[in-house]
Amino acid sequence: MLDACLNPELAAEITCQPVRRHGVDAAVFFSDIMIPLALAGVEVTITAGVGPVFEQPVNSVTEVNRLVERRILDASAVEKAVALAVAELGEDTPVIGFAGAPFTLAAYLVEGRGSRDHLGARAFMHAEPAAWDRLLSWCADLSGEFLRIQVAAGARAVQLFDSWVGTLCLADYTTRVAPYSRRALESVSVPRIHFGTGTVHLLEAMAECGSEAIGIDHRIPLDEAARRLPGKVLQGNIDPARLAAGWENLAAHTRDVVERGRSAPAHVVNLGHGVPPETDPAVLTDLVTLVHEL
């Protein structure tokens, strides 16, 4: 996976394929939230059925102090991949860059791999607040630099992914995570989308981090999200499970999502999370066609 992300021609081709095959209106740059860590020399592998695995977890003050000395040394593969995709797609189809949010990166680093509740990261946050600040600051700067690299190469919008932030309570998010997400988002001036999963209790706090749009997962109706986030563009929130529920069910659900999305100033129609790998590609094509007709 990481090798594919760092092969410019292959990454550009994978970026462009959904536009050609499904007719989507924008292309999300093909990469992985682990790429900036790998470019900074952090030893990480993607293990089938597990996800990212770190040879040396960053779960002590000593390890944090060692980590924060690292910097991205060579991003030429990413720069070339974005530039190739931008050139291929032209002016009518923007490329969207992305990066992992500081908390999600830190959770992986502290625990050495993904976990259900991220107890290790949450414990470290409270047990070593000064080291947590250094770690989150470093992650914010790394993600910010990764976003800047993509924008400089031609990406016209970016998205900050906080996959694991839903495990936090509001107080911890507001005081110990949100400032660093804001720091990462402030690194670029193109339109920014801020997305997390399981974040119904965090939406207002996320909206204060400086993005123009908020990504919404399937757990809350879009009209309710729009009421809670006045003036914010929304992205989402088709339930990925509906892709395997039959066309009539998916179509009815999609119409409902689009109708509720009209409550927001604008709505970027998308899934509430990633495409399940077993999804029939033809269903995605039909879904895009339906949305364009609504």
Regions found by a protein language model. Give the residues of each.
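Active-site loop segments of alpha/beta catalytic cores
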Residues: 74-294
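A short acidic, glycine/proline-enriched capping/turn motif at secondary-structure boundaries
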Residues: 33-36, 51-52, 60-62, 102-104
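N-terminal basic, low-complexity leaders that serve as flexible interaction/assembly modules and, when applicable
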Residues: 1-48, 178, 183, 281-294
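Short, conserved acidic/polar surface loops in the N-terminal third of protein domains
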Residues: 38-42, 57, 106-110
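A glycine- and small-aliphatic-rich helix-loop capping segment at beta-alpha/alpha-beta transitions
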Residues: 43-52, 111-116
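The substrate-binding groove and active-site-proximal loops of carbohydrate-active enzymes
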Residues: 2, 6, 64-75, 240-244
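A gly/proline- and charged-residue-enriched helix-loop-helix capping module
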Residues: 48-88
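Short secondary-structure junctions and interdomain/linker hinges
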Residues: 8, 22, 71, 92-96
